[in-house]
């Protein structure tokens, strides 16, 4: 029975890796959700006897997933969160035993019930921000414990605790609940940041930004200027979606960004990843938008979930970038007349942190300078150092 379950897990892993390589699973949210579900199944059905064994297995799985799609930073982020959860739950049990406290709060089958409830509530995204803050504080207390991270090096995570699996499963379910509710949690803050008669500019196609603007439109009257984001033309999808929601929407070309920026009160965008220094890896064209906004002293607000928080650094436009086919904007028959021309189609832009005014996340607003603190609260330093 155990061998059959193990084979099934390996099959699921290989299938997901194949989907990542073929890009049949796309989008940071979908990839993050699928990664978290896979790791939950591995914790639930995998063969591991103690926390160290599980940590080693999750690291191996994480490397395989990240190698399959290196620029999907959210995969590594979810893996690091799960590793952080495993260590925190183990340390909780370890400290309780050390201090003579009871570790029998979890029933052996609690994780079965929690998993079932989680699956039944997939469509219930009405999770308020305060509840998510409380959940995250469960993992942020690493900075407040009696023994700091530096003193944990002598803990080998090999001791076994009967209730550990249930505790880890419960925490991973909370992580998945957080992913499910993040769009609503970000959107609930819209009224605080968008005021009547404002003109908002955005670009690309971000579900988080769309829901943020639609939520604000329920109580505010404002205009939205959408940059079409050539050559992918993702902005057209956003413009159509906002128009259907009865929001006054204007679609402009990328070249018109600077000319229109003087009329804008605020720029609201999404991002592919938030780097360790508070910079962004975002849709191509975002850097031009950000520079124009800074010139006109227009604040840039980034709507994102914290699952995009990445402990890596990007220093220029070439770091962590991908190049698409020039055929999207240059016809093949025209290429023969361009012998000495090199044509590039970058997928992403790097936006420096000094160009960003505010991050609106699923647990509230943060300045770019606060990102380093969030990294300490969400990831274990050992996993970050291993990535480097």
From Swiss-Prot:
Query: Per its UniProt entry, which superkingdom is the organism in?
Result: Eukaryota
What molecular functions are annotated in GO for this chain? guanyl-nucleotide exchange factor activity; translation initiation factor activity
Q: Which GO terms describe its cellular component?
A: cytosol; eukaryotic translation initiation factor 2B complex
| Cytoplasm in keyword set | yes
Which InterPro entries does the UniProt record give? eIF2B_beta_subunit (IPR051855), IF-2B-related (IPR000649), IF_2B-like_C (IPR042529), NagB/RpiA_transferase-like (IPR037171)
The answer to whether UniProt assigns keyword Cytoplasm to this entry is: yes
* One of the GO biological process terms: translational initiation
Q: Which residues form the signal peptide?
A: none
Task: Tell me the Gene3D superfamilies matching this sequence.
Answer: Translation initiation factor eif-2b, domain 2
The record's subcellular location field reads:
Cytoplasm, Cytosol
Q: Which UniProt keywords apply?
A: Cytoplasm, Initiation factor, Protein biosynthesis
Which residue ranges are recorded for the region named Disordered? 109-133
Spans of biased composition, class Low complexity? Answer: 116-133
Q: What's its job?
A: Acts as a component of the translation initiation factor 2B (eIF2B) complex, which catalyzes the exchange of GDP for GTP on eukaryotic initiation factor 2 (eIF2) gamma subunit. Its guanine nucleotide exchange factor activity is repressed when bound to eIF2 complex phosphorylated on the alpha subunit, thereby limiting the amount of methionyl-initiator methionine tRNA available to the ribosome and consequently global translation is repressed.
Assigned protein family? Belongs to the eIF-2B alpha/beta/delta subunits family.
Oligomeric form and interacting partners: Component of the translation initiation factor 2B (eIF2B) complex which is a heterodecamer of two sets of five different subunits: alpha, beta, gamma, delta and epsilon. Subunits alpha, beta and delta comprise a regulatory subcomplex and subunits epsilon and gamma comprise a catalytic subcomplex. Within the complex, the hexameric regulatory complex resides at the center, with the two heterodimeric catalytic subcomplexes bound on opposite sides.
Q: What is this protein called?
A: Translation initiation factor eIF2B subunit beta
Q: Which organism is it from?
A: Dictyostelium discoideum
